[in-house]
C-alpha cells in the first residue's frame, strides 16, 4: 500500500491517471479495513496519501478528516502507542518494524496537529503525550535516516501549536493574563528556534565528519 500511495501522489503530471489511482487506492483501503487487514504498510500508505495527494481534485471522495481517523484507528489496533522503549543501533534488523512503526505514529501526530488547526473549536484528534516525545528522542538518537534528527523539533512545534490553541480557546481572558500567556508562549517559541539551530549545527558537523572519513 505504501508503494501504491507513492505512485498515486507522484502521478500529478496526468490528472486522469491520478484520479483513477486515487479512486482505486481508496477502494483497496476500504476493502482491507472491512476484511480486518490492518497493517503498518496500510497505515504508511494512508499517511503518504493524506500528506501529499491533491485532495481538492476528489470533491466527492471521503474527507481528509475521515481518512485521518482511519489512520488513528489502525495505529491504535497495532498498539503503536505502547512500543518498546529500547534504543538500539540501526544495525539491529529485528527492530526495523518498531522503528518504522514509531515513525508512522509520529506521522499520525504531525498530520493530526496540522489538520486540527483548520478545525478550530473541535476536539483534538490526537494530543501530545510523553510516548511521542520518547519515540522522537529514540529515533533521533539512533539516527538511521537523516530525517530522524528533526523528529524532536517537529514534536516541539506540534506541541507548541497545541499549547497556543488550548491557551486561547473560547475564553475571554483578562488583559494581564493574556500578556502573561503570550510571554510564556513567546519564550517557548524562542527555545524551539534555538533547539532548531543547535540541531542544524549538529547535523552539519556530522555531515562534514562523514564526508571527511569517506575520503
Q: PLM features: what roles do these ranges have?
A:
Residues 131-133:
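Protein-protein interaction and targeting regions used for scaffolding, dimerization, and localization
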Residues 1-4, 15-83, 90-107, 111-128, ...:
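Extended, leucine-rich alpha-helical cores of fungal transcription factors
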Amino acid at each position: 500500500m505504501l508503494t501504491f500511495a507513492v505512485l498515486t501522489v507522484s502521478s500529478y503530471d496526468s490528472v486522469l491517471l491520478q484520479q483513477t489511482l486515487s479512486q482505486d487506492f481508496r477502494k483497496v483501503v476500504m476493502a482491507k479495513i472491512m476484511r480486518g487487514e490492518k497493517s503498518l504498510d496500510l497505515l504508511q500508505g494512508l499517511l503518504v496519501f493524506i500528506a501529499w495527494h491533491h485532495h481538492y481534485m476528489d470533491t466527492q471522495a471521503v474527507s481528509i478528516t475521515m481518512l485521518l481517523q482511519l489512520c488513528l484507528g489502525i495505529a491504535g489496533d497495532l498498539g503503536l502507542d505502547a512500543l518498546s522503549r529500547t534504543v538500539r543501533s540501526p544495525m539491529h534488523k529485528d527492530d526495523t518494524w518498531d522503528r518504522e512503526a514509531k515513525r508512522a505514529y509520529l506521522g499520525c501526530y504531525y498530520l493530526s496537529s496540522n489538520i486540527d488547526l483548520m478545525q478550530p473549536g473541535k476536539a483534538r484528534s490526537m494530543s501530545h503525550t510523553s510516548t511521542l516525545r520518547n519515540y522522537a528522542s529514540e529515533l533521533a538518537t539512533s539516527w538511521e535516516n537523516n530525517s530522524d534528527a528533526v523528529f524532536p523539533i517537529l514534536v516541539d512545534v506540534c506541541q507548541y501549536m497545541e499549547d497556543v490553541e488550548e491557551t486561547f480557546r473560547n475564553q475571554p481572558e483578562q488583559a494581564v493574563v493574556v500578556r502573561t500567556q503570550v510571554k510564556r508562549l513567546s519564550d517557548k517559541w524562542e527555545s524551539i528556534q534555538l533547539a532548531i539551530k543547535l540541531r542544524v549545527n549538529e547535523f552539519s558537523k556530522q555531515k562534514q565528519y562523514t564526508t571527511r572519513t569517506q575520503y
